[in-house]
A protein has these predicted regions:
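Non-heme Fe(II)/2-oxoglutarate
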Residues: 1-85, 190-228
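Catalytic core of non-heme Fe(II) oxygenases with the double-stranded beta-helix
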Residues: 70-174, 178-187, 191-192
Length: 228
């Protein structure tokens, strides 16, 4: 399931994050430092060092915004969110086809983290650069994603995906992973659809007993499938 979440960050937050990233040249490192064997062969970008104060400061801003976003909570059912990272692609940079690693180690904690969902939060307007589309492959084919600054895309971490070469300008983004309460994508999709239906029924003044029954079904399924 691919889900677009608009306006995770407001324009002022985007400006602040962009300004900090563009003013912090010394914190940028080769993006291959965090790539696995497969990704290292096809990854050509830069990212902010994970242990830098900039990464921690800006990552906390992103996490605070996610906590206040009901669409993100409903779609991802987050158990843990990997500390947000930040990357940039200049001209001729790209990230070839790959699949994200299934398990990551959260830096400095020793905690192993299962990557159920991948997230890209765009920090550059689409007309600021050419190329740089996030291409995500699923059973329905290939999907090209290039969103407004402040918007985010969620997709299964098991997906084959790539970032196409930049031919003009610069692409800035935050990227991270979510370990969901429900690891199976099909189950999360069903719960997400049910949650949206429940919210719609509440807005339309549906019979309360029917809404309560559907809400009970949602929570019983969540109880059955939750992995904590």
């Amino acid at each position: 399931m691919l889900i677009q979440i608009p306006q995770v960050l407001n324009p002022e937050q985007v400006r602040r994050i962009r300004g900090t990233l563009l003013a912090t040249e010394s914190a940028w490192v080769d993006g291959r430092v965090t790539a696995g064997h497969q990704g290292m062969q096809v990854k050509r970008n830069q990212q902010i060092a994970e242990d830098s104060s900039v990464a921690h400061e800006l990552g906390d801003m992103v996490l605070a915004a996610l906590e206040k976003n009901p669409l993100f909570i409903s779609a991802a059912l987050p158990n843990r969110v990997y500390p947000p990272m930040f990357n940039r692609y200049g001209e001729n940079m790209q990230f070839g086809s790959h699949v994200d690693g299934a398990v990551r180690l959260i830096p400095g904690t020793g905690i192993k983290f299962r990557t159920d969902i991948s997230a890209t939060l765009f920090l550059a307007e689409p007309d600021n650069y050419d190329g740089g589309e996030l291409m995500v492959e699923d059973t329905y084919g290939m999907h090209a994603v290039k969103l407004n600054a402040g918007d985010m895309i969620l997709y299964p971490a098991s997906s084959v995906h790539q970032v196409t070469p930049i031919t003009r300008g610069e692409r800035l983004a935050s990227f991270f992973w979510i370990q969901s309460l429900v690891r199976d994508d099909a189950q999360r999709t069903l719960l997400f659809d049910m949650d949206r239906s429940i919210q719609h029924l509440a807005l339309t003044g549906a019979v309360e007993a029917a809404r309560i029954q559907l809400t009970g079904c949602y929570h019983n399924l969540l109880r059955m499938w939750t992995d904590v």
